Design a protein with these regions (language model features):
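Residues within alpha-helical transmembrane segments of multi-pass membrane proteins, especially transporters
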Residues: 14-18
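Phosphate-group recognition and catalysis centered on beta-loop-alpha active-site segments
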Residues: 5-9, 19-260
Length: 260
């Protein structure tokens, strides 16, 4: 019976690992992007493990305008680069990000590429890579940060001499409000999935740029945003025809996992 249970557990573990496995491409897919600038989503995540130094370096070595990454708070008041609030999807382990210390998070082994382990990285390391490769840092504020925490993030990047090359993005409008209270002219984009008159009016009023799901953007809305002086970023586009159509429409940025 014990032997049978052990076999069941091993099979379950193998199935879990297989279900989490991701197929990575060996090179980017080139497109006719016109004047649109390309942003590598969570680094070059179509080729490397998302939000890792490997993904950021891979993007840095190519023609991308910007490298996007997600930042969350840790239990000990630090800032880690990771998308999900739980590491289960990327590590196979139930680890809550904001209830873990930076040391614990950096020790977690991620599901790697070609059987090679990967690990998370810090906000400072991400900014350093953007700086090394002269890329715009597109930093998504994932947590619902306090104004004090936003101040700490801004202070850390300012001390590194790279704040002028950072665009803050977030689904949480308060995060961007705090950024603008501290740095009134800082580049900022609001992330949203559907067109909404109230959102449009708010963005135009606050002069916060647009980061919209490509599925929601219409030519009429694009014209309205551009007429108001707002820049438009579409996410997350991995289809060549869709990307080239958006570029022809005149979007400013295309966020992608693999297109270049």
């Amino acid at each position: 019976m014990k032997k049978f249970l052990a076999i069941v557990l091993l099979v379950s573990l193998a199935l879990t690992v297989c279900s989490c496995a991701k197929v990575y491409k060996t090179e980017t897919v080139k497109i006719d992007k016109g004047s649109a600038l390309m942003i590598a989503h969570r680094g070059l995540s179509g080729m490397e493990v998302e939000n890792t130094e490997s993904a950021f370096i891979a993007a840095g070595e190519r023609s991308y305008y910007g490298i996007e990454a997600d930042v969350r708070r840790t239990a000990d008041g630090d800032f880690v680069i990771v998308h999900d609030d739980n590491l289960r999807r990327i590590s196979g382990k139930n680890i809550l990000v904001e209830e873990s210390t930076m040391e614990e998070l950096l020790a977690a082994e991620l599901i790697g590429k070609d059987g090679q382990p990967e690990r998370l990285t810090t906000l400072l390391n991400y900014i350093n890579i953007c700086k090394q490769y002269d890329k715009q840092a597109i930093l998504e504020l994932k947590s619902e940060f306090t104004r004090e925490e936003i101040g700490l993030i801004v202070g850390l990047i300012t001390a590194m001499g790279y704040i002028d090359r950072v665009t803050f993005i977030s689904f949480d409008y308060d995060n961007l409000t705090y950024v603008r209270e501290i740095l009134p002219t800082q580049s900022a984009m609001y992330l949203f999935k559907k067109l909404d008159k109230n959102i449009t009016e708010k963005l135009i009023r606050d002069k916060i740029d647009v980061a919209i799901s490509y599925k929601a953007l219409t030519e009429e809305a694009l014209k309205e945003f551009k007429a108001a002086g707002l820049k438009v970023n579409c996410w997350t586009v991995d289809d060549v025809k869709v990307a080239e159509r958006l570029a022809a429409m005149g979007v400013d940025f295309i966020t992608t996992n693999i297109l270049e």
